[in-house]
Regions:
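Feature captures the catalytic ectodomains and active-site-proximal regions of enzymes
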Residues: 2-207
C-alpha cells in the first residue's frame, strides 16, 4: 500500500539477488485512494462496475464506512472465477503491524502449497501518514530521499524480506505492485465543509 515508483527503485538492490526482475509501469486508478485503487486491483473492475456488481460497496461508500477494503478476498476470488481459475487455491493475508508480519513469516511454510499467496502490506502507507504527524518521524523522514531510505531500511530488516527469500528458494514467481503513491504537500489548503463531509485527505465528498 502506497509504494511509489521511486520506493521500488530504492529496494531493487535488495531484490536483485533473489529474483530476475521485470519492471512494468502502470497508473493508479483515480481517485488515488485505497478504497478505490486497491479494490480495483483485487476486483479487476472500475468503481462504477464494482458498485453495480456489489451494491453493498456503494452503500458503504455513501455511509463512509470505517473500512471499504474488507471484501478484498471475495473480490479476488470472483476475479479468479471470471478467468475460469476456480481451482486455484488461495491464501489472502493483510498485515498492519510488525507482530502480524512476524507471525506470517513463522507460518509461511504452511501456505507454500497454495497456488496463490496474496499479501497486503501497509507499512509504507502508515509511514506516509504518520511522518507528517509525529515529530520523531519528521526528523527521520525530512524529505523525499529520507522517505526512500526509510522504506529501504525497513525492508532490509523486515519480516517481508525473509518471506521473499523463502519464496525465492521455493522458486515462486512474485508480483509486487502498489495501489497508489503519495505526494509531499508543500502548500496545504483549508477545505470548508459541513459535518457530513468525508474526513479523508486524498478526496472529499459531501457539502
Amino acid at each position: 500500500d502506497c509504494m511509489r515508483y521511486d520506493h521500488f527503485k530504492a529496494i531493487i538492490p535488495l531484490l536483485e539477488p533473489l529474483f530476475n526482475i521485470k519492471l512494468e509501469y502502470c497508473l493508479s486508478l483515480l481517485p488515488t485512494a485505497t478504497p478505490y485503487s486497491r479494490n480495483a486491483i483485487f476486483s479487476g473492475m472500475f468503481p462504477d462496475e464494482m458498485v453495480e456488481k456489489y451494491p453493498h460497496q456503494a452503500s458503504d461508500m455513501k455511509e463512509d464506512a470505517p473500512s471499504l477494503n474488507q471484501y478484498e478476498k471475495e473480490f479476488l476470488i470472483d476475479q479468479l472465477k471470471l478467468f475460469e481459475l476456480n481451482d486455484v487455491s488461495l491464501h489472502y493475508h493483510k498485515i498492519w503491524a510488525v507482530d502480524e508480519g512476524n507471525k506470517f513469516q513463522n507460518r509461511v511454510k504452511d501456505y507454500a502449497n497454495q497456488d496463490l499467496i496474496t499479501l497486503v502490506v501497509n507499512f509504507v502507507d502508515i509511514l506516509a501518514h504518520k511522518s507528517s504527524q509525529m515529530d520523531v518521524l519528521k526528523e527521520m523522514v525530512p524529505d523525499e530521499s529520507g522517505y526512500r531510505l526509510a522504506v529501504k531500511n525497513w525492508l532490509e530488516q523486515s519480516w517481508l524480506l525473509k518471506v521473499l527469500k523463502y519464496f525465492s528458494e521455493m522458486g515462486f514467481s512474485v508480483v509486487m505492485t502498489s495501489d497508489h503513491g503519495s505526494i509531499r504537500v508543500q502548500n496545504d489548503v483549508m477545505v470548508s465543509a459541513d459535518r457530513t463531509a468525508s474526513s479523508g485527505v486524498r478526496y472529499k465528498y459531501g457539502r
